[in-house]
Amino acid sequence: MEVNCLTLKDLISRPPRLDFAIEDGENAQKENIFVDLSRMAPKTPIKNEPIDLSKQKIFTPERNPITPVKLVDRQQVEPWTPTANLKILISAASPDIRDREKKKELFRPIENKDDVFTDSLQLDAVDDSAVDEFEKQRPSRKQKSLGLLCQKFLARYPSYPLSTEKTTISLDEVAVSLGVERRRIYDIVNVLESLHLVSRVAKNQYSWHGRHSLPKTLRNLQRLGEKQKYEEQMAHLQQKELNPIDHKSGERRRDGCPDSQDPQLLDFPEPDCPSSSANSRKDKSLKIMSQKFVMLFLVSKTKIVTLDVAAKILIEESQDIPDHSKFKTKVRRLYDIANVLTSLMLIKKVHVTEDRGRKPAFKWIGPVDFSSTDDDLVDVSTPVLPELKKEIYGHVQFCAKQKLARHSSFNSEQASERTQRKVNSEPSSPYRQKQGLGVYSLEIGSLAAVSRQKMEDNSETVAFASQNMMPLPSSLDPAAPLPSPSVDSEYRVSPLCHQALSAAQTDLKALPAQNGLNGQGGVSLASMALDVEHQPQPLAAAQPLLYVPPAPLFMLCGGLQEGLSPGSGSGSGSVGGGSEVTAAEQPPMPSGQKRLSKERRLQEEEEEPATKRQCRDHEDGPLSLVMPKKPSDSADIASPKTSENRASAPHEDTHMNGQLSAAKAVSGKATTNGFVSSEWGNPCSNTEIEKPSEENESTKGPSPLQYLYVQPPAGLNGLSVLLPSSQSPHAVGLPVGPLPSLSIQYMVLPSPALSGFPVLCSPTMPGPVSSAPSPLPNVGPVNFGLPGLGSTAHLLIGPAAMVNPKSSTLPSTDPQLQGPCSLHLSPVMSRSHGSVQPGSPAYGSLPAATVKLQQSPVPVTPKSIRCTHQETFFKTPGSLGDPVLRRKERNQSRSSSSAQRRLEISSGGTD
């Protein structure tokens, strides 16, 4: 019963406890707990007694009121204070805190039950485990780092996208896909934009460019960093850190006066920030800071930059107050930039040891060597527009002259820079050009003498020839005459026989060794100022060929005439062969000025006295055929007596001594000298080419014509002069007198068809190539020299600017002026720097040369004038009418009063 009574007492006392529990649950937020405490006041001394959990079940009802001890703790945890609203705001702002509060509320209804203490312990354990799970779900600091995020960002796009591929970046989509805030993506994009890897298109829209322009951007930043003198500032700050006391006085002085470098530092000539004031937000943007941060690496000698130094430089540059808060902000922003640059593999983190310990720094591992001439030089090897060619031609030729004068085989001074500038800057004035080239004329003789002396002293002729014929490594070097025609894909032309056939390099190298000193198409080493705008062209079928880049002027001629005695001369002349090339070094002329100056040239050649002609020839003479180094203006024949002494004679004697060969002066038999001479410098001496024999078709019979081809000089009418020389040597009569004249028939052709033609020399072609359809209609090959020689060296002229081997891109014309005229040339002004004398070692093996002129069948001018009595040379539709000759006569009579009398061109031609 007693037990039951206790049970009844318990039942009687339960309702108020349940009411209290319900009231407590309903009014927990109303702080009504103090009412119960007042009722419990008499038993307060017992609440501090230790609680035995093992005896909790058998406690008497009198001791039950001590159970709300936890309620007192709740009172202290959740007071109603003015800051209670702050907790509500935090709970609303953070879902994590709100979730914690909900988890706590789940256990509150059972706090006052019998097992309240055990449940409270379980509550604490569950709460801790929930926090641990939440921490596991939250990403770590490394996972949230900007560097790792940038790597994920860069992995979405190719480093080197195709030019046709256009990639647009949406920052919203990227932020959602990567699960980060958009501001983090903005930080990455701003740094990438500073290096021009991306560009802004619209709001939150960027275009991806990749790393194509990164080297150029870094080079520009390096130049800007050098202008801003960042290297000096870094050195100053490092010295200041080492000796802080020494710099205090300097700082006080600097406070009083403004820094002289501030205007330069504020001037940031980036196209993206035209107005970069010191305190503008744009100057403090992450993009500008990134560019300046990269500049510090590029101008640093050690390529290591600490963030402290970088922050100080940027703070001083932006004229901010150097307080600690701004410094920490700068360092924090520089860390963000450094993380992105690290992801780009441009820098890496290192540690620098100082007096106070190790300090983190960053080292540049990106590209370092930026060539300063990348965007200054023009790649002339690639096909460029004609306008660009005209602009850079003078610069290329000017550089060619400088390198030519510094060649090791010469002992001459370089011409003055002012004269070179005058020559290049006034290409439209023929008279100025003659004055400009007069300075070079003093060097020509000595150069020719030196090269001739070296050739005579060298006994191993074949080795010498092969040594001189090998191309030099530099593609822009004027001394590199023989680029390989079969290597590059750009070396394409219209074939002579409408076939595109290539020659091997071994054949190309074997040709000078076989024929370099035997007169079979040797090409001078340093005579070629390579015109890189013209590229090698296709060749004839399976023949080793020699490529000569097209010079502004070509004279092509062949070997010796019949009947020459082998022992009549010593021959210091053309050991190099029957055809030589001297590249012109003058820039091309506008075509509009060529017509006027061509007629002037013919008038001056007719009317210039022999004395002035001789004096001018002394100034503008040609070089030796063997090793011409400077532009030459005429080709003549030297006597064997002067040829013997030519090597050791000074350059004045080289220009002035014995002008006629012994064969011409004594027996009328003359050598046919062939070389390519540059006529750009002296337009008045363009047609001063002496041929010892005139064309005589009746006596020579079926033998092909021999001629000299003279390409038009700069500023003239685009006319080429062809001087046939197949006339019998007995037909040449030399009158007795100090200034005898020689009557030579010549042909005037429009030069646009021949202006860009390279010369292809082959020693293996047994006969003339006449089966190919010629651009000049029915033009047979022209042979030079002895017809009875076994092998012939063929000089093939083809258009130079060919894109397709089957089609010609050069516009060509039929002859505008074809007419026989007699050129009365004075032998006194003749010179034979490149003549092959009968006694020379090259005399016996000098072959004939076949010259073919190729031209597209479409004429530039509608007129097709035909020479009636020279049908074997050029057979073209139309006829060579008298109006052309009458026009010449009018031009000659119009300028008959001129004191410069050079040539007498008669109206009637000689056969």
Swiss-Prot record:
In contrast to classical members of the E2F transcription factor, atypical members contain 2 DNA-binding domains and regulate transcription in a DP-independent manner. Both DNA-binding domains are required for DNA-binding and are proposed to form an intramolecular structure that is similar to the winged helix structure of the E2F-DP heterodimer. It holds the Pfam family E2F_TDP. Residues 243-257, 415-424, 599-621, 688-698 have a biased composition (Basic and acidic residues). Belongs to the E2F/DP family. Residues 141-210, 281-366 bind DNA. Keywords: Activator, Cell cycle, DNA damage, DNA-binding, Nucleus, Phosphoprotein, Repressor, Transcription, Transcription regulation. The modification Phosphoserine is found at residues 94, 409, 840. It is found in: Nucleus. The lineage of its organism: Eukaryota, Metazoa, Chordata, Craniata, Vertebrata. InterPro entries: E2F, E2F_WHTH_DNA-bd_dom, WH-like_DNA-bd_sf, WH_DNA-bd_sf. Residues 566-579 have a biased composition (Gly residues). Atypical E2F transcription factor that participates in various processes such as angiogenesis, polyploidization of specialized cells and DNA damage response. Mainly acts as a transcription repressor that binds DNA independently of DP proteins and specifically recognizes the E2 recognition site 5'-TTTC[CG]CGC-3'. Directly represses transcription of classical E2F transcription factors such as E2F1. Acts as a regulator of S-phase by recognizing and binding the E2-related site 5'-TTCCCGCC-3' and mediating repression of G1/S-regulated genes. Homodimer and heterodimer: mainly forms homodimers and, to a lesser extent, heterodimers with E2F8. Dimerization is important for DNA-binding. Interacts with HIF1A. Interacts with MN1. It comes from the Eukaryota. One of its GO terms (cellular component) is RNA polymerase II transcription regulator complex. Residues 239-281, 409-433, 565-706, 873-911 are annotated as: Disordered. Residues 669-687 have a biased composition (Polar residues). GO terms for biological process: chorionic trophoblast cell differentiation; DNA damage response, signal transduction by p53 class mediator; hepatocyte differentiation; negative regulation of cytokinesis; negative regulation of G1/S transition of mitotic cell cycle; negative regulation of transcription by RNA polymerase II; placenta development; positive regulation of DNA endoreduplication. One of its GO terms (molecular function) is DNA-binding transcription repressor activity. This is Transcription factor E2F7.
